Each structure stands twice: as C-alpha cells, then as structure tokens.
Swiss-Prot record:
EC number assigned by the record: 1.1.1.8
Protein localization: Cytoplasm
Record-level GO BP terms: carbohydrate metabolic process; glycerol-3-phosphate catabolic process; NAD metabolic process; NADH metabolic process; positive regulation of protein localization to cell surface; positive regulation of sodium ion transport; regulation of heart rate; regulation of ventricular cardiac muscle cell membrane depolarization
Mutagenesis or variant effect for residue 273 to C: In BRGDA2; uncertain significance; significant reduction of sodium current when coexpressed with SCN5A in HEK cells
Protein name in UniProt: Glycerol-3-phosphate dehydrogenase 1-like protein
Amino acid sequence: MAAAPLKVCIVGSGNWGSAVAKIIGNNVKKLQKFASTVKMWVFEETVNGRKLTDIINNDHENVKYLPGHKLPENVVAMSNLSEAVQDADLLVFVIPHQFIHRICDEITGRVPKKALGITLIKGIDEGPEGLKLISDIIREKMGIDISVLMGANIANEVAAEKFCETTIGSKVMENGLLFKELLQTPNFRITVVDDADTVELCGALKNIVAVGAGFCDGLRCGDNTKAAVIRLGLMEMIAFARIFCKGQVSTATFLESCGVADLITTCYGGRNRRVAEAFARTGKTIEELEKEMLNGQKLQGPQTSAEVYRILKQKGLLDKFPLFTAVYQICYESRPVQEMLSCLQSHPEHT
C-alpha cells in the first residue's frame, strides 16, 4: 500500500512565508507524495476592515505582505496555530526569529514525533554558552529533525518566478532531499549540503553586513567601498562560523547561494540595506523606519547585530569583528554613521 501523502504546514505568512507558500502550493498539486492542501498559519490582523485570513482564503492574496501575487487556492490560511500544525508531517518555519521560542512552546506535543521541519528564519539567538541557532531551539524544544534553507532569495522576485538559487543544509541528507522535492521549481534551484550550521549562520550574519552596506550607500561612498564592506563582512562571517559552529565548517559552503550570493543580493537589493541607507540619510531611528518602510515588519539585521555583539563581548572578541561591532554601535549606541568608514580603515584584515 502506498504511504499516506505528507501533510505540509507553513508556520508564518509574511513576505517570504507567502512567497514560499506560492511555490509549495503549486508543487504539491503535481506531486502525489504530498497532500494537496497546504495549511499556512497567519498571525491574525485586520486589513481594510477584513481579517487577513479571510482575504487570503477568499481572494487568494496576502494583500499586506505580498501584494500583487496570487496564492494557489489550495493554500489555506489559519489563525489558530495549534489547529494549523495538527498532524503535519512537514513543518516550514518562516517567522521573525524573535518569536521562535513562543511558537515552539505553543506547538510542542501537537505535532507527530516523526514530523520533519525546515527553517527559513534568518537570525540567531543567545544561550548561556553564547551562540544558539534557530534550528537548535526548534530541535531541542520539539524533538524533531530540522533542516535549513538560506539563499539569495528576495521574496518578491521569488514570487514573480524570476530565476534564483538557494541552499538547503541538512544533517540528515535524506530529509534535505525531501524538502528539495517539495520546494524546487525550474526557477528556484536548490543545492543540498550537509554543513547545515554554516548555511544557517550565513543567513543570519549577512543581514548585519547589509546594514553596513546601506550605511555606505547613505554616506554616498561608492561601489569600491561597498565591495570592501562585502569582502570584509564575508571574512568576519567565516571567522565567526569557525569560532562558534560546533561541527566542521567548510569554506566551500560560503560559495553556495547561502553564502556569497545571498550576501551580494542583500547588500544591493534587500530591505536591511534600504532601511540602513534611510537611517544614514534621515537620522530617524530603526524603529521609526520599520513602521514607515516595512509595514511594521521587523528588520533582522540590527537585531542580529545586537545578539552577535553580546556574544562577542562575552567572549572578549569585539576587536576581531570591527564591522559587526560598528553596525551594532551605530544602530543602538548613537555612534555617528561615519564610524562605518573608520572601522574599514583600521580593519585587522589590513594589518
């Protein structure tokens, strides 16, 4: 007898979550291995007097976070998290990283023990020993195997079906390949690697570098300076991974889409760069700019810089990571944006 089709639940429905829902919804219709209905948990909001779940389920569009892109009709929005994840075989986590503890606590015990997860969340957390990856939190709280997906994937371009690549990191290769089957399309090409922790760290740390790139744009520094920010940022990403990753760190992983490609696209096209440029030019706070420019969605770069700063400070390593440190101090300690340039001029890479 054929195995029952695998039920998929997407935990999150922001800009990226909705773009991924479009891919998964279309793919499961063609693949017998997966159940044809995809549940998507939506943090309920009212938009123009209507519930967001009602808009998605009736108009098949997330008008708040992914306007202009129709979602497949087999994607069902649900506001009750416990009901959405009930009996799910495959969980796709795509929420702001600061909510992961609360979400895991709410759904632990409601998901089958054999369920598998994949996190698309770009961020890190702090534990008593320092760095804690989002995948570690999900694994520890829920007791399920978890893969990660990171890459040069600006959500609106993915939703518009423009060609891009991405990387899945999985400690159990078979599980990574299953998620590849669920997610790959002719225009969304996936490579699976086993260096999962490095893949995940790339996704978090590149947002800090993108904030630095945005500061340079705000200061009108030019392309050469921005290229230096990208290169020095990449060097700090590699150094950070070598210090804090528990397993082997392969330099080749930084050449995958999750590494240098994601870093480039985020430093030229992402919202971390855009908001950082506005921060440098207007003098407004990050919080004010989030409200104005992002519909209130949280920016990952500044928050990740704060977590990285505390982890580095605890280990006495701030002087080894001047770019990461400068981004934090400019965002949160009222240091002048011009300090971005000083940190480049005196970077230990040049001594």
